[in-house]
């Protein structure tokens, strides 16, 4: 569930209908509003409160401050968080103009200061983060233990999309997709299916 104005009760009904994932928590997601003077929680609160929801988190150091990353970690725990880049074409590229979505009908976005912006320069348009940046932010800024941040980037997403029988861990019989990095989380080697690419 995500890109949603759902109220809390709708989000709970979504669980009953089989929803298990909240897409990029805090981004394009309903939260507390006032209705006739009463506070009404939204999808955000349902995703944090209900264990049935795993949550995707764009931990790029831009979408969410370290304090919110810590709050998510405290409320969901390591096993219910999946780090996602939400990256678009400008990921890993220099500042400039890129298209979000279709090459023929995509939305023009501007990449600067480590984030993709809508033309108004205010709203974010996805992310330009890479996976190593997310691990770095979670460990260095939010203080999450490295092994837990790596689980959030590997086994947790694999489990949520139903491919944990082949991806997400290092073990006999698993796909040998590996990234080796140093203490600064700078990538040193990349292996896909056991073959070194970098």
Residue ranges and their predicted role:
Residues 39-57, 61, 73-85, 90-174, ...:
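His/Asp/Glu-enriched, well-ordered alpha-helical/loop segment
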Residues 10-13, 68-72:
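A short acidic, amphipathic alpha-helical/loop segment
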Residues 1-40, 92:
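Histidine/acidic-residue-rich, glycine-tolerant segments that coordinate divalent metal ions
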Residues 2-7, 61-64, 185:
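Short beta->alpha connector loops
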Residues 184-191:
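Short, Lys/Arg- and Gly-enriched loop/turn segments at beta-strand edges
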